[in-house]
């Protein structure tokens, strides 16, 4: 999956998993990596106003009118998006989405809206495992590939189902996170019931797959489901509007090569299911490339708790583990990049690449943009002095 990108090298270690380092000095605002998610879903609460294909929300409050008439669970913003996605959707997750709210399935009182968004994601991935691996019945994307060529997606890093399976997963146990363990147990049970209901109740494949084979396939799906949940919980990305509203989630294995730091040197800029990773400030050759998984403007313990219970790892970055003087210095440094807009959690970055700072005059104006809301901040080269 990971082809050569100028200035990046993929490495791995037992403690940090796979990660990226700079193989040369990197300037401010460089495009380091562009990637498209392997699979993305709209939020359960916004699915009728957000497009399932481009994962973008219409500016108006009017509900979308184009939808999948088989499952009635996904909507599209226009005919082009529907034509690009509908056949693939109906090949994979459609028949499972159709039964998500079936009265035959057990009702779990601890399932909130976010849980159903997560279930839509997991079911989408498992439906690909069912079709591509168990049935050897991959969807042919000839037309989609033609569209991708027209959109210059050859610059993007693409992902496969195997890449999803290769993601690092952090185990959730009764000891490490009992609440999360209980929720995951319920999701695993629900998904097992869903696949039993759909596959054993299906009449379309009876002529080619007998019930014994279906039961064996369901067993294999059940074996995969918990692992997939662990992987996606640690590696998925939210898709946000400029108003800081989460309209969906995406799994993009190549994006997961950027480890977390509370003093990151990169940021991710999201456009629907597409992501571009940009350098925030000059990065030296040999340094690891990092982003932040969480809101940075929080006390140390709050950040550690969010990472522990949301991503299941203990943060070892210098901003969480240094002495008080160095932590204060790092707090002051990274806080300059926080967006000034109220409630926005984005970071200021430069859209164009900026040449070496010492070649610029001291009063040279540099325009920075927020990675979330596009708010503008005009600075001078001294802004980047540590």
UniProtKB/Swiss-Prot annotation:
Keyword Methyltransferase attached: yes
SMART domains (alphabetical): SET (SM00317)
GO terms of biological process kind: methylation
InterPro entries in UniProt: H3K4_H4K5_MeTrfase, SET_dom, SET_dom_sf, Znf_MYND
Gene Ontology molecular function: methyltransferase activity; zinc ion binding
Source domain of life: Eukaryota
Coiled coil: 136-171
Pfam families linked to this entry: SET (PF00856)
Zinc finger (MYND-type): 51-94
SUPFAM superfamilies in the cross-refs: HIT/MYND zinc finger-like, SET domain
First-level EC class: transferase
Transferase among keywords: yes
Disulfide bonds: none
Residue ranges occupied by any SET domain in the UniProt entry: 6-294
The protein's Enzyme Commission number: 2.1.1.-
Cellular component terms (Gene Ontology): nucleus
Keywords in alphabetical order: Coiled coil, Metal-binding, Methyltransferase, S-adenosyl-L-methionine, Transferase, Zinc, Zinc-finger
Function field: Probable methyltransferase.
Similarity comment text for this entry: Belongs to the class V-like SAM-binding methyltransferase superfamily.
Name by which UniProt lists this protein: SET and MYND domain-containing protein DDB_G0273589
Lineage of origin: Eukaryota, Amoebozoa, Evosea, Eumycetozoa, Dictyostelia
């Amino acid at each position: 999956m990971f082809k050569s990108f100028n200035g990046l090298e993929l490495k791995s270690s037992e403690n940090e998993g796979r990660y990226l380092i700079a193989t040369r000095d990197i300037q401010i605002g460089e495009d380091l990596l562009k990637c498209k998610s392997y699979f993305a879903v709209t939020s359960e609460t916004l699915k009728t106003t957000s497009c399932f294909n481009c994962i973008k929300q219409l500016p108006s409050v009017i509900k979308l009118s184009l939808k999948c008439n088989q499952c009635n669970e996904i909507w599209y913003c226009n005919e082009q998006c529907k034509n690009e996605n509908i056949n693939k959707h109906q090949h994979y997750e459609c028949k499972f989405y159709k039964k998500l709210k079936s009265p035959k399935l057990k009702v779990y009182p601890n399932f909130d809206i976010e849980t159903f968004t997560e279930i839509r994601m997991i079911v989408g991935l498992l439906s690909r495992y069912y079709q591509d691996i168990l049935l050897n019945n991959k969807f042919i994307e000839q037309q989609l590939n033609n569209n991708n060529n027209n959109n210059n997606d050859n610059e993007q890093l693409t992902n496969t189902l195997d890449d999803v399976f290769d993601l690092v997963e952090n185990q959730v146990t009764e000891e490490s996170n009992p609440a999360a363990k209980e929720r995951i147990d319920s999701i695993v049970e629900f998904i097992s019931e869903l696949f039993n209901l759909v596959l054993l109740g299906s009449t379309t494949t009876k002529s080619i797959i007998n019930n014994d084979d279906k039961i064996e396939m369901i067993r294999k799906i059940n074996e995969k489901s918990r692992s997939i949940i662990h992987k996606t919980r640690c590696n998925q990305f939210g898709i946000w509007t400029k108003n800081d509203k989460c309209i969906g989630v995406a799994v993009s294995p190549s994006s997961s090569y950027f480890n977390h730091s509370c003093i990151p040197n990169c940021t991710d800029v999201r456009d629907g299911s597409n992501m571009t990773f940009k350098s925030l400030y000059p990065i030296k050759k040999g340094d690891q490339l990092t982003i932040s998984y969480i809101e940075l403007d929080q006390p140390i313990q709050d950040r550690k708790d969010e990472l522990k219970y949301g991503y299941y790892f203990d943060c070892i970055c210098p901003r969480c583990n240094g002495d008080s003087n160095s932590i204060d210095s790092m707090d002051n440094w990274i806080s300059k990049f926080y967006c000034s807009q109220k409630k926005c959690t984005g970071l200021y970055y430069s859209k164009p690449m900026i040449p070496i700072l010492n070649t610029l005059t001291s009063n040279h104006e540099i325009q920075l943009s927020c990675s979330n809301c596009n708010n503008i901040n005009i600075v001078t080269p001294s802004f980047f002095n540590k």
